[in-house]
Regions:
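Substrate-binding cleft of extracellular glycoside hydrolase catalytic domains
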Residues: 3-133
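Alpha-helix initiation/capping motif
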Residues: 50, 139-140, 213, 220
Length: 262
């Protein structure tokens, strides 16, 4: 088992995603290792809530990470808009912008039209709840083999930021060392916004017990704040003074009453 902190590649931000499989034993260590954002699994299909989602959100946000949640789609259960609302319900009164649709599996008889319809209705469910713009997560192989050809015709879906999962190895630890290691086939998207480059058998994340998915966000920290609808560093707030870094997040969470953070 080998631990590795954030990559800190120029022009990128490091992030993680977690579920009940991981134990976040030291959230401060996660932040000190350089990770800036996290997605916690909220739900799976219509009936399942991850039992640790709210604890993960509370712990990671208190350490200074920007947080959101993801919903693992179970397309055979139908009702995609309700699956979106289930994720929000499981997350509770927490910061919910950039909720992620995790669409990576489906019965073999589901075609690309049916899958794209599901995805569009999921994001519509987020819109109905005022949850902000969502993010589309999938694997390269699922994108190419299951979502094509219909995805190329779905302007609304292509407008969603793409969180692409593609690993160089499933058996040994690997991490990119330069931007040339990050090129992926993303059509019909111009490029990925987030890349999950490591999961099981990857490098361990400081402060977390168990394999943990590692991600890169394309952009600077200022871009990451803007992505989540947060103001730039140094923004003056009504309470007085100038706030810096992730202090912005705590202030906004308090003012919007979006989370049980203390």
């Amino acid at each position: 088992m080998s631990f590795l902190g954030a990559l800190n590649l120029t022009g990128f931000c490091d992030a993680i995603d977690v579920s009940k499989v991981q134990r976040v034993v030291d959230p401060d260590a996660v932040r000190k290792a350089g990770f800036l954002a996290a997605w916690a699994k909220a739900s799976e299909g219509l009936g399942y809530c991850d039992p640790l989602v709210q604890q993960h959100l509370k712990d990671l946000s208190s350490a200074g990470l920007i947080i959101s949640v993801y919903a693992f789609a179970r397309v055979q259960q139908g009702n995609p808009s309700e699956q979106a609302k289930k994720a929000l319900s499981c997350a509770g009164n927490t910061y919910q912008t950039r909720v992620m649709l995790d669409l990576e599996s489906a019965p073999k008889d589901w075609g690309s039209v049916q899958l794209c319809d599901f995805a569009e209705e999921f994001f519509q469910g987020l819109d109905e709840e005022g949850a902000g713009d969502g993010t589309f997560y999938t694997y390269t192989s699922f994108l190419q083999e299951r979502l094509h050809p219909e995805i190329a015709r779905r302007v609304k879906l292509i407008a969603k930021p793409l969180h692409l999962a593609e690993y160089k190895s499933l058996t040994t630890s690997w991490a990119p060392t330069s931007s040339s290691d990050l090129r992926r086939h993303t059509g019909p998207w111009k490029d990925w916004t987030l890349l999950q480059y490591s999961g099981n058998a990857g490098y361990q994340v400081p402060g977390i017990v168990g394999d943990c998915d590692r991600n890169l966000f394309r952009g600077t920290y200022a871009d990451l704040l803007a992505f989540f609808g947060l103001p730039p560093e140094g923004t003056e707030v009504d309470q007085g003074g100038i706030i810096h870094g992730t202090d912005i997040i705590d202030d906004l969470l308090d003012s919007r009453k979006l989370g049980p953070f203390g």
